[in-house]
Amino acid sequence: MNPADEIVQIVDEQNQEVAQVSRRVMREGCLIHRACYILVFNRSREIFVQKRTMSKDIYPGYLDVATGGVVLAGESYEQSAKRELAEELGVHKVGLTSHFDFYHEADNNRVWGRVFSCLAEGPFVLQPEEVEDGFFLGMDELQSLAAAAQFTPDGLMVLKRFMAE
């Protein structure tokens, strides 16, 4: 199925379900939706950073500190997180820790997100349609890179809040 045709859950400002529409309609209308964000760490406490493909419908080619994606209609945040880990990284049967929910709004994106973390060493099987490359970075390296490269703004916001808690 073309990702633009996937049916996603639309919510209101209080994260209450209001409709189900295609991803295309959601993006075109900048409708509030749900997404999961998974911070993937290795045993050295480095975080997995992925480079998004140029075909992504939002932030193409950007770096992202979170694996994850849009919650589909009928899915819970946790079901979505497990699906996204399997699709994007080939990671199955990993323990997820839920951290916090948040609302993020930008010019082209309005989302209620839930943040998870997990421990996974790799090697990963990257989904070529979504992930161009990926690598683990320590926090100092990540801060240096974030100052010089394009990162997804919601991903950086998630990491900043995660590190503060």
Residue ranges and their predicted role:
Residues 2, 64-66, 126-130:
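Short glycine-enriched loop/turn motifs at secondary-structure junctions
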Residues 2-37, 43:
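Acidic, metal-coordinating catalytic segment for phosphate/diphosphate chemistry
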Residues 24, 102, 107-165:
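Nudix hydrolase/Nudix homology domain
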Residues 29-31, 58-62, 137-138:
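A short, polar/proline- and glycine-enriched secondary-structure boundary/capping micro-motif
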Residues 35-67:
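A glycine-rich, hydrophobic loop/mini-helix early in the fold
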Residues 38, 67, 98, 115-116:
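A structural signal for short, well-ordered beta-strand segments
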Residues 48-49, 66-98:
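The catalytic Nudix box helix
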